[in-house]
A protein has these predicted regions:
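Enriched for short, Lys/Arg-rich terminal
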Residues: 72-110
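Short, surface-exposed, charged/polar-biased interaction segments
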Residues: 34-41, 45, 64, 71, ...
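An N-terminal domain-start capping segment
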Residues: 1-2, 46-49, 100
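Secondary-structure transition/capping residues
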Residues: 24, 31, 54-61, 104
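A short, surface-exposed loop/turn module that caps and links secondary-structure elements
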Residues: 45-75
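Arg/Lys-rich, positively charged N-terminal/basic patches that mediate binding to nucleic acids
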Residues: 1-44
């Protein structure tokens, strides 16, 4: 019997990804809103397959983001960091960021 996988995404993460669509479009990273939506949909698709992706332990100094993390290289220039907690087959996605954020220095420890 296959156990059910439950993936819960914190509201702060969904809000961030919703805003990301608008940001990518208005800052002209994408010429069409649909392309920005597709970009974010690909991130969601990656997250929903978290159970099949090798994850790493988060360094102690940033475990407030989550005890584990995975990385997703969506483009040549952008690496996404997805932080989460896990118990059995339940995953709580707590934080998402990328290497372009203003204070990305903490990501260098990963």
């Amino acid at each position: 019997m296959v156990e059910k996988i439950e993936i819960i995404i914190a509201k702060s993460v969904t809000n961030y990804l919703d805003e990301l669509i608008y940001t990518l479009y208005t800052k002209e990273y994408f010429g069409y809103i649909e392309d920005a939506e597709n970009y974010v949909t690909a991130i969601y698709n990656f997250v929903y397959n978290i159970h099949s992706i090798q994850h790493k332990n988060t360094p102690q100094k940033i475990t407030h983001f989550g005890n584990f993390y995975i990385t997703y290289k969506r483009t040549k220039r952008t690496m996404w960091y997805i932080f989460f907690d896990k118990k059995d087959n339940r995953y709580l996605i707590k934080h998402i960021t990328n290497n372009h954020v203003e204070n990305a220095t903490f990501l260098h420890s990963l």
